[in-house]
């Protein structure tokens, strides 16, 4: 199994990049891409579904092409294509109307939907789930049905009761209100701080993290990563841990080194018998990012779910002072 990075733009995976990569499976997080926070709009979601469906039927000839949302792309093979939709914090949309998941738009059985209760109930609960297309579900039962479930029956029954009663939905609604308040407070304090004129907050409308970009010091990947690390070190000395965007690259690439950063998602090309390969590359799929060759602003992945509201002014002040100190 080969794992290949796929370019992202402001709306998600780039269709032409999918065709060039000649992949069979795209792993994506359309509700809230990590680490950029991009939410894929419905129009791009439909285009991704059309890409997945276009791999099912054999092309009419070697030069065959298909129109996907007005773009001409080659139908590169007759192999089945799938989208793995990792919807890891879809419950926490902070602004705007909810966007339907790929699985809800899929009418051809091309989406493998996966989610977890780690964000809503806590990581210690360790319950996740996957919804397979019917054809794949049958193959899963035939080939892997001997695997025992690692989640105890008591935990499953308790969660089922919690959901059936409506208490789970009420719990998530309360969490969403609480997190929205924390998000608003953090952004307001940072914007009003001494570094506020240099900060831009991107993709804060969904999920439990957003990007804080620093204006005025845009450089190449190495320059931006170096600036990020210096700011992070200053904040760490005072007890605040920042997550520089430059750290999100394939294993083995150091911050600022030639390699991969944050503007891509991941696709795989699979041979028919390479089921085991999925396990070997799982970590790479979750950490996959992009070619780090362009220019970008320094940025930080800002999580806020664990912040208490009374600590936000202090934390924001430390972050602001670290940025100002490096800006000089």
What positions do the PLM features span?
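PLP-dependent class I/II
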Residues: 1-328
């Amino acid at each position: 199994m080969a794992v290949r990075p796929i370019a992202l733009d402001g709306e998600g995976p780039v269709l032409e990049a999918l065709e060039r990569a000649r992949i069979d499976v795209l792993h994506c997080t359309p509700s809230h891409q990590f680490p950029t926070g991009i939410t894929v709009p419905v129009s791009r979601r439909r285009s991704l579904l059309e890409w997945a469906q276009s791999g099912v039927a054999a092309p009419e000839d070697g030069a065959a092409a298909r129109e996907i949302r007005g773009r001409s792309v080659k139908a590169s093979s007759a192999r089945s294509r799938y989208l793995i939709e990792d919807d890891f914090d879809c419950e926490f949309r902070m602004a705007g109307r909810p966007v339907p998941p790929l699985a809800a738009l899929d009418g051809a059985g091309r989406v493998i939907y996966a989610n977890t209760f780690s964000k809503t109930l806590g990581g210690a609960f360790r319950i996740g789930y996957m919804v397979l297309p019917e054809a794949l579900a049958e193959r899963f039962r035939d080939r892997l049905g001997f695997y025992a479930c690692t989640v105890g029956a008591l935990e499953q029954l308790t969660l089922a009761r919690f959901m059936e009663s409506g208490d789970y939905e009420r719990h998530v609604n309360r969490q969403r209100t609480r997190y929205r308040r924390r998000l608003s407070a953090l952004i307001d304090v940072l914007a009003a701080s001494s570094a506020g004129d240099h900060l831009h907050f991107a993709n804060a409308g969904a999920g439990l993290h957003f990007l804080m970009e620093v204006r005025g010091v845009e450089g190449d990947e190495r320059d931006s990563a170096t600036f990020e690390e210096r700011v992070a070190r200053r904040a760490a000395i005072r007890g605040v841990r920042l997550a520089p965007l430059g750290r999100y690259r394939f294993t083995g690439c150091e911050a600022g080194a030639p390699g991969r950063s944050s503007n891509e998602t991941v696709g795989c090309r699979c041979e028919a018998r390479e089921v085991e390969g999925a396990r070997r590359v799982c970590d790479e799929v979750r950490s996959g990012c992009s070619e780090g060759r362009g220019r970008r602003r320094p940025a930080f992945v800002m999580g806020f779910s664990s912040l208490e509201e009374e600590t936000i002014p202090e934390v924001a002040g430390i972050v602001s002072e670290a940025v100002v100190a490096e800006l000089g």
